[in-house]
Curated annotation (Swiss-Prot):
<dbReference type="InterPro" id="IPR037034">
    <property type="entry name" value="RNA_pol_Rpb2_2_sf"/>
</dbReference>
<comment type="function">
    <text>DNA-dependent RNA polymerase catalyzes the transcription of DNA into RNA using the four ribonucleoside triphosphates as substrates.</text>
</comment>
<dbReference type="Pfam" id="PF04565">
    <property type="entry name" value="RNA_pol_Rpb2_3"/>
</dbReference>
<dbReference type="GO" id="GO:0003899">
    <property type="term" value="F:DNA-directed RNA polymerase activity"/>
</dbReference>
<dbReference type="InterPro" id="IPR010243">
    <property type="entry name" value="RNA_pol_bsu_bac"/>
</dbReference>
<dbReference type="GO" id="GO:0000428">
    <property type="term" value="C:DNA-directed RNA polymerase complex"/>
</dbReference>
<dbReference type="InterPro" id="IPR007120">
    <property type="entry name" value="DNA-dir_RNAP_su2_dom"/>
</dbReference>
<dbReference type="InterPro" id="IPR014724">
    <property type="entry name" value="RNA_pol_RPB2_OB-fold"/>
</dbReference>
<keyword id="KW-0808">Transferase</keyword>
<dbReference type="Pfam" id="PF10385">
    <property type="entry name" value="RNA_pol_Rpb2_45"/>
</dbReference>
<dbReference type="InterPro" id="IPR015712">
    <property type="entry name" value="DNA-dir_RNA_pol_su2"/>
</dbReference>
<dbReference type="InterPro" id="IPR007642">
    <property type="entry name" value="RNA_pol_Rpb2_2"/>
</dbReference>
<dbReference type="GO" id="GO:0003677">
    <property type="term" value="F:DNA binding"/>
</dbReference>
<dbReference type="GO" id="GO:0032549">
    <property type="term" value="F:ribonucleoside binding"/>
</dbReference>
<dbReference type="InterPro" id="IPR019462">
    <property type="entry name" value="DNA-dir_RNA_pol_bsu_external_1"/>
</dbReference>
<comment type="subunit">
    <text>The RNAP catalytic core consists of 2 alpha, 1 beta, 1 beta' and 1 omega subunit. When a sigma factor is associated with the core the holoenzyme is formed, which can initiate transcription.</text>
</comment>
<dbReference type="Pfam" id="PF04560">
    <property type="entry name" value="RNA_pol_Rpb2_7"/>
</dbReference>
Amino acid sequence: MANTLVGRKRIRKFFGKIKEVAEMPNLIEVQKASYDQFLMVDEPEGGRADEGLQSVFKSVFPISDFASTALLEFVRYTFEAPKYDVDECRQRGITFAAPLKVTLRLIVFDVDPDTQAKSVKDIKEQDVYMGDMPLMTENGTFIVNGTERVIVSQMHRSPGVFFDHDKGKTHSSGKLLFAARIIPYRGSWLDVEFDAKDIVHVRIDRKRKLPATSLLYALGLDGEEILSTFYNKVVYDRDGADWRVPFDAERMKGMKATVDLIDADSGEVVLEAGKKLNARNARQITEKGTKFLKATDEDLVGQYVAEDLVNAQTGEIWAEAGEEVTDKLLKSLEEVGITELPVLDIDHVNIGPYIRNTLAVDKNSNREGALFDIYRVMRPGEPPTLETAEAMFHSLFFDSERYDLSAVGRVKMNMRLDLDAADTVRTLRKEDMLAVVKALVELRDGKGEVDDIDHLGNRRVRSVGELMENQYRLGLLRMERAIRERMSQVDIDTVMPQDLINAKPAAAAVREFFGSSQLSQFMDQTNPLSEVTHKRRLSALGPGGLTRERAGFEVRDVHPTHYGRICPIETPEGPNIGLINSLATFARVNKYGFIETPFRRVRDGVVTDEVAYLSAMEEAKYYVAQANAQMDENRKLTEDLVVCRRAGEVIVVGPERVDLMDVSPKQLVSVAAALIPFLENDDANRALMGSNMQRQAVPLVRADAPFVGTGMEAVVARDSGAAIAARRAGIIDQVDATRIVIRATEEADANKPGVDIYRLQKFQRSNQSTCITQKPLVRVGEFVKKGEIIADGPSTEFGELALGRNVLVAFMPWNGYNFEDSILLSERIVKDDVFTSIHIEEFEVMARDTKLGPEEITRDIPNVSEEALKNLDEAGIVYIGAEVNAGDILVGKITPKGESPMTPEEKLLRAIFGEKASDVRDTSLRVPPGVTGTIVEVRVFNRHGVDKDERAQAIEREEIERLAKDRDDEQAILDRNTYARLADVLIGQAPVAGPKGFKKDTTLTRELINDYPRSQWWQFAVIDDRLMTEMEAMQKQYDESKKRLEQRFLDKVEKLQRGDELPPGVMKMVKVFVAVKRKIQPGDKMAGRHGNKGVVSRIVPIEDMPFLEDGTHADIVLNPLGVPSRMNVGQILETHLGWAAAGLGRKVSKAVDAYLKTQDIAPLREEMKAIYSPGELDGLTDEELAEAGNNVRRGVPMATPVFNGAKEADIEQMLEMAGLDRSAQSTLYDGRTGEPFDRKVTMGYIYMLKLHHLVDDKIHARSIGPYSLVTQQPLGGKAQFGGQRFGEMEVWALEAYGAAYTLQEMLTVKSDDVAGRTKVYEAIVRGDDTFEAGIPESFNVLVKEMRSLGLNVELTSSKKAANDQLEPPADAAE
């Protein structure tokens, strides 16, 4: 870390013992690599590979018309530059996308009417616009309609073949019924399954089942071939009254002899009944020379004939293949003199007669019948013909248009069934189906294992690119139908490709996917960690995945193959637990979509630095040692027995048998879990909460990196894109709060400018309304390398993730205020803005063109006092910096209302005073309840052709000035660099020509050259040709750069001045951003990193907080009872180490002060050398060391990586070094009495986060508000400004209490008695406090509903007098 610019400014002490050999992959590579592979924006030499977008076009094109007289071919595709850049898209609310142009070739044929021979008549090529394709931003997100979205990767079942059984649940006997299923990437599913009677059936697409032999018949096999495929043949030879059968040791090995085995030649008993034939006695029998065994007729009865026995002369069939051998059959065979009887090798123990039995029950006996049967199942009610049945069967599994196993499916199938088809064979073959049935029968015979569908070798990841590819294919297929029809309708000789294509379906498919797919999610942008985690998320839900209700326990559970691939900790609590997972830190996705994790190779017990990435299937073959296996200095494994994993089991083997070793202890957890120090000391449930709550931490006004970190903080800050990294090496030229200008020093590419300008985001709103703001970390003149952090973003400090603050905690009860996880805070926390955050709310208003006339944004609003307009400018828009409260006007807007007929008096008044205000109503944008803050930004959007108001013009002028400043700065640096290079070339030369007044052959010096204006330097001419060409090239490059710069500026200005694309009917739109400063207050939720969460119960004056002997007050008091039962001891260890870190910080602080006085760096260097590990301070200059020391005054930051961090001894050593008690407990004094507490208290620094559950967002009150239209009851919820529901149970409570009048009030005048509501109001205004309840509207709704069912209900009153007032129910609701 100390070798980067920012890393030198503050150095983190590292406790890790295990050296990491593998580089952690970029955290958002999953997204970027996948989408890049799909788009392939730049076409490589030799054309694009057949994947992604290219393969989609290739699979749909060429398209021919119905008569095959024309063909539309795909040539290539290209992307044009996007119209707007990322920031412009965000501001204007549009999608960041690039236009896709496809080159198509239309070939028209001439067909000879006699011979039907085709000849090419005409070929036309044209570029066709195919809609916009969304582009991914630098940070792996998409901008759709102005909001950032993430496409979450999906985990689904890998295509291929799976074998499984029903776990004995189907049949009452508990018998296992085996089944196989072939799952393609797209196409029909094929199931092969046993039933309780051991007959094999097939189902296609979960339809009605058929005997499996029907499928085999349909594949073209006949009965005899089916039997010979599945069974071996044994030939029995007549030997007098008995039979001779060949002795095959291999086949019979492991079988038990039911009768004595007798040698057919010698008559000797070679194996007694009841004994098992094992390798030893099989060898003995073979050595004796036994070739044949003796068999009797009894042995043959019950066997099955292997092939048809036919009389060659007459063609008479004596026995059919598969027929059972009976005494009767044997007799008849003896009579006709047959001495050889081939039977199937079925012993009912190791080999069962399942296929033979299936063949026997199958009513079909030929291909035609089988095809008809399959056709009837798939298309019931249609009469089959042989052609249609054959065509349908072919299209089910053998047609590449309809059926695609995908490369993955083929690879998986080859592995499972030991086949060797190339992975380009994407349809099923006859061999595949036979192999599946064979494997299934073998399973039933007890050979082999069923598959585990939760094994990560059987689940794969579909990332953005693949999801998008599938979606685009659907769009193109819809388009293809339209093109075919179009080609047949038009005169094909005169049209161009453009006229045939309507790209709407393709564009609509893309739009639908990004806008409304379950996997396209609104990005969680609360803080940088939540962004990274969202992009690394794996969901089992979504189209083609599981549903919450159907997912059982097994799918959600942690599986041994998750190790190093999927985090066992980070998953949501609740219904989605285990269905939404997170990728582990080192994991990556391979080309087949399987998750891989890295291992170090181990050879002969010696660990190498060679790293191999393996998927779950590949890993199963190896013995894998843990990352913490003990080694000597030569990396030889030292233990006699090493604990290893193999195929999901933990075993102990000798070091020479170890094949691989984990690369890092943190490779099994995800990014969020890897940020929890002392994770190994926390209970898993609490660690889960800890990793989930870090994602909800709100960025604070002042970020503060943790004293006790894990070393992952810098990685997350860099990869999330929150902190800005330098694109090229260079020297800082200018820095201010809004931008950093770097002069590039690496050899500049002629097309790139020699200067990089980084615009910093200032007070921008994130998706979750948190505040995104960046601040520079570099100073003018500093040199930065490529990739170094130059600016901090939200929740980062010195390029490290900083989600919360380090606060001084005391673990002790405090007058019940920290009962049940409540948190007690000191007033200092509020006063010093420790947990203050800024939230930016966005409000927008549109002025539309209505039927009655256009709405108008103006300051001139009827019946509004001047006081209410104090914050508006002359255009009626609030000015920046105004402080606004709930109800204040942000944008004045009036809407025309329909003219009502006027009375004569009104007409007269109107004629006299010209009063016009009555025909408009006030529809201004006001601040909603509960919001107070400062206006930080206003954006005004105008439709094309609508005149801009003064405010819009002012905003535009400001923006143009900013762009001009950027251009001028870039120009200045370009001038400086170019002319410096030119001066270097010219000085010392004696030009033969030059500007006016130059004497030729004068040797140029710097003073001489500076006498001329720089623009005239190009006029110097020297004799040296090489120098002249160099100067000319330099001048050309300079002129081009200058031109490009100016052009870029003009383009941007033109975009600004152009009108905006607004929704239809909208003339003008104004967006107002209000920044709300939220201090921490009782009711806010806070949490540590160990799942220790709580709600702030009280904020206590600092003088009442417990304090130490030196007068330091605790910032926060937590309840010690929150620790033991929750078993998250990590927080206590963190507190201890944080205490040591602060103590060491105090020591360094003293040394820095001494250095500032004496300017002697040696004592400071010694002090810091004692703290840090050897080598961590190497290469630091004195100034850098002093700066590093100054930056750790508050506490020396430490890194204790998960499973590889500080142990108790290390913590004690640090405490001693800091001069603190080894117990890390201190005597505390009660702030209110000044008395010491009886026992010492654990005190230290803990890292606390303020979560996004703020009381200000939840608290809500209503007096008068909106009512529901039908029921007339108040709406519910804060967003609707609703009331609190007085529900069924609350009614019971009032009934039980006997509070009849209160109850009546609740159910009528306070809810939905419309007339009663107004009467109550009038009575209260009059000062009268009696009122009567009427009929609630919900009663009328009920009556109306009953009437709609044809039940007439009428309300009659028993009181005669009351009848006059009560209207008949028919009109009650009107």
